[in-house]
């Protein structure tokens, strides 16, 4: 069975921090690096993941990969200097894959994951699928990358529209 192998991965990947009798963590991907974030103030472990989507899915330019890694390492240092507990999952670690990561989190006893809206359909589907399989609750927070909030766009992109035009949205 793989569960014995999984235990070894889990121990090296995450530490347990209990918050309100719930084991919670903040999951941060390479496109979600923010200096000011409400996630940093909740007292949870921050897990920075060099996810396969951003590092392995395609043959990315080496400078792009170096930039992602340097940015993530910089955020790790920044958070540690603020006294926030951080775990860093390298793209070389098996847990950089959504399935393995969520299995590891479940095996370690985590039940609640805070993260930003992934803004990537593939990553969103993977996270939704694996969270259901592993029994993890994901709490999505508004992504600061965007001016509009998701609920603000519901009126415009409702089911009543048959066609979408750039001019109608921006003018």
Regions found by a protein language model. Name each.
Residues 9-91:
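N-terminal beta-strand-loop-alpha-helix module at the start
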């Amino acid at each position: 069975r793989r569960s014995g192998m999984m235990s070894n991965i889990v121990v090296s990947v995450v530490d347990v921090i209990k918050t309100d009798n719930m084991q919670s963590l903040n999951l941060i991907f390479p496109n979600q690096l923010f200096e000011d974030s409400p996630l940093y103030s909740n007292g949870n472990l921050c897990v920075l993941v060099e996810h396969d989507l951003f590092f392995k899915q395609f043959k990315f330019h080496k400078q792009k990969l170096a930039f992602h890694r340097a940015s993530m390492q910089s955020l790790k240092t920044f958070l540690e200097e603020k006294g926030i507990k951080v775990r860093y999952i390298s793209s070389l670690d098996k847990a950089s894959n959504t399935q393995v990561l969520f299995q590891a989190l479940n095996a370690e006893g985590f039940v609640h994951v805070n993260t930003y809206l992934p803004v990537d359909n593939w990553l969103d589907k993977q996270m939704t699928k694996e969270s259901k399989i592993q029994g993890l609750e994901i709490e999505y927070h508004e992504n600061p990358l965007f001016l509009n909030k998701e609920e603000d766009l519901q009126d415009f992109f409702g089911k009543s529209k048959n066609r979408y035009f750039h001019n109608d949205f921006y003018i």
